[in-house]
Amino acid sequence: MRLRNIPGAEAALREYPTFVDNPLFYKGNWKERFGNNNPIHVEIGCGKGRFINTLAERHPDINFIAVELKAEVVLRAVQRTEYKAIPNLAFVQYDASKLTELFADHEISRIYLNFSDPWPKTRHAKRRLTYKSFLNTYRQVLVADGELHMKTDNENLFEFSLNQFAAERFQMRNITFDLHQSKLAADNVMTEYEERFSSRGQRIYRVEASCVIK
Amino acid sequence: MRLRNIPGAEAALREYPTFVDNPLFYKGNWKERFGNNNPIHVEIGCGKGRFINTLAERHPDINFIAVELKAEVVLRAVQRTEYKAIPNLAFVQYDASKLTELFADHEISRIYLNFSDPWPKTRHAKRRLTYKSFLNTYRQVLVADGELHMKTDNENLFEFSLNQFAAERFQMRNITFDLHQSKLAADNVMTEYEERFSSRGQRIYRVEASCVIK
């Protein structure tokens, strides 16, 4: 997502109780931050924040963490919380390729990848969030039966991702080429991007993949 | 494929040296029929026969068997052989759901499914050639590292098949949503149906799946 640079975004973030200024401090101890042992679900790249905010409302027994690289993007998402302290929601500004700095081995239960950058050029394949090096990072921080839930409107990224999941021995499930016309539509929480693109007739692809320990 | 009923098709078939009139006789002994121990590749549903005839020409070190239910369809395909005896090619008229009557356990190395009937109605899902009961039959007759190669122009059948392969623990590879634009196009042998449909701009989906013994 492209946003204007927002001067002072990083300072502004610290005003929000759901923003975690010192995320490395919680590695291996996120349960302390949340004050309970509930499962932790992570969204990588939070867009405008509707998805993670909605899930946090719907599932008070799950702890949600949004990990997003750009301060301006985190700020847009965290603004939805209106300075409220939401006990099961946290926003982190960090590089997703370094998830192992944020989370101990097997500390989290699920990862959401929503409309990640497709990086269409072959020479940028390693930057795609389903490239095998990312999958191995996810496997490290996810519990043994942990899951990845991926949505995209980009067919090439979807095709690439299915092949990566298969090659890295992730167990796939609920593969759909048209989420909004599928039986999974009822429980689907749309991101802002998803709503805009699907309203133009763009189909949404989705897959769940669980890490089968090699 | 729909064809007019051809009177006397079954009798006509017996005139062709590549047609095997008594296929059950060879169960477990197809190497006797071919006179060698070369790997056996099977096409289920042979269409007009170009695919299997072309593969047999290109790969003299592989034995090919086309299994097709309808006598009229087998006849059209076998007519391409022009009454020649082709040492590594055999045509069989038989029901693919009964492959275990034709082949001993682990007797064959590869199965091709080309443009199988999509059976679009949900209540007919069990008839699709990638339904789990078929996959378990294939697993039984295929060698341990045996492969299924599937092509289709039907997106719903492809989506269904990917889910079946995943659920039945087949290891997928080379998943492509547009075969003719992919790196696999160079080695692709087009069926008659494929040529006709792709010339109209219809995309071809393809996947390889190998049976990982449970």
Swiss-Prot record, chains A, B:
Keyword S-adenosyl-L-methionine: yes
Keywords attached to this entry: Methyltransferase, S-adenosyl-L-methionine, Transferase, tRNA processing
Binding positions (substrate): K121, D153, T191, E192, Y193, E194
InterPro entries on file: SAM-dependent_MTases_sf, tRNA_(Gua-N-7)_MeTrfase_Trmb, tRNA_methyltr_TrmB_bact
Catalytic residues, chain numbering: D117
Domain of life: Bacteria
Transmembrane segment boundaries: none
Any matching Pfam family: Methyltransf_4
Pathway assignment: tRNA modification; N(7)-methylguanine-tRNA biosynthesis
Name of the protein in question: tRNA (guanine-N(7)-)-methyltransferase
Biological source species: Brevibacillus brevis (strain 47 / JCM 6285 / NBRC 100599)
Gene coding for it: trmB
